[in-house]
Curated annotation (Swiss-Prot):
It is an enzyme of class 3 (hydrolase). This is Beta-fibrinogenase mucrofibrase-3. Keywords: Disulfide bond, Fibrinogenolytic toxin, Hemostasis impairing toxin, Hydrolase, Protease, Secreted, Serine protease, Signal, Toxin, Zymogen. Residues 19-24 form a propeptide. One of its GO terms (cellular component) is extracellular region. PROSITE patterns: TRYPSIN_DOM, TRYPSIN_HIS, TRYPSIN_SER. The lineage of its organism: Eukaryota, Metazoa, Chordata, Craniata, Vertebrata. Monomer. Its EC number is 3.4.21.-. Expressed by the venom gland. It comes from Protobothrops mucrosquamatus (Taiwan habu).
Length: 257
């Protein structure tokens, strides 16, 4: 009963900046209940994020999703009518690229969470593998989350929405957003003509390109889904050594520059 009450009544507030620490998918459709067993729902400080289950003890999300009193729910589809196999966890440890937990819009927006106890695999809970090859521009990607489905007005759905978008050349994002450096550890993804995008409430969730987990929802334009204003995603492949090192117990491993 406590779990049902929490899932049904938690409020979703928007961050005061353009980062998608509460983003939903614009222009998508309801995800199939069986297509996202790795997708986790993260609540903190009255905000929400997404995340990805890597194994029974570890979740990968965005650094800007860090907050107090974090709760992590696995096996969720409908927030109003929870699956019977929903599980709740809290962080045991959090790991960031920088010990000061700093990040920018183009670097280090990534956080590994070790759960307080292992997750039990079930019909709606299963991990997603890390990528075996780097992302390729032009790939069709799947983005998903419980973020708002309208922008700038916010409408939050009961179930996660999914949308297919394209992995774009990084220069498209540089043209859209002043201040992005010539190179970064991010990916640029969206639809050039607009209409589909991750948005407020989707942050931390996965970007899956050609079947591989390549990105973490980070930030984008405001309003969301505008023409030639794609979303910016943390590049998972670029951080593989750091992710694998932390999970293996090597806390001295460093993130790529």
């Amino acid at each position: 009963m406590v779990l049902i009450r929490v899932l049904a009544n938690l409020l979703i507030l928007q961050l005061s900046y353009a980062q998608k620490s509460s983003e939903l998918v614009i222009g998508g459709d309801e995800c199939n209940i069986n297509e996202h067993p790795f997708l986790v729902l993260v609540y903190y400080d009255d905000y929400q994020c997404g995340g990805t289950l890597l194994n029974e003890e570890w979740v990968l999300t965005a650094a800007h999703c860090n907050g107090k009193d974090m709760e992590i729910y696995l096996g969720v589809h409908s927030k109003k009518v929870p699956n019977k196999d929903v599980q709740r966890r809290v962080p045991k440890e959090k790991f960031f690229c920088d010990s000061s937990k700093t990040y920018t819009k183009w670097n280090k927006d990534i956080m590994l969470i070790r759960l307080d106890r292992p997750v039990r695999k079930s019909a709606h809970i299963a991990p997603l593998s890390l990528p075996s090859s780097p992302p390729s521009v032009g790939s069709v990607c799947r983005v998903m989350g419980w973020g708002t489905i309208t922008s700038p007005q916010e409408t939050y759905p009961d179930v996660p929405h999914c949308a297919n978008i394209n992995l774009l050349d990084y220069e498209v994002c540089r043209a859209a957003y002043a201040g992005l450096p010539a190179t970064s550890r991010t990916l640029c993804a969206g639809i050039l003509e607009g209409g589909k995008d991750s948005c407020v409430g989707d942050s931390g969730g996965p970007l899956i390109c050609n079947g591989q987990f390549q990105g973490i929802v980070s930030w984008g334009g405001d309003p969301c889904a505008q023409p030639r204003e794609p979303g910016v995603y943390t590049n998972v492949f670029d951080h593989l050594d750091w992710i694998k090192g932390i999970i293996a117990g090597n806390t001295d491993v460093t993130c790529p520059l």
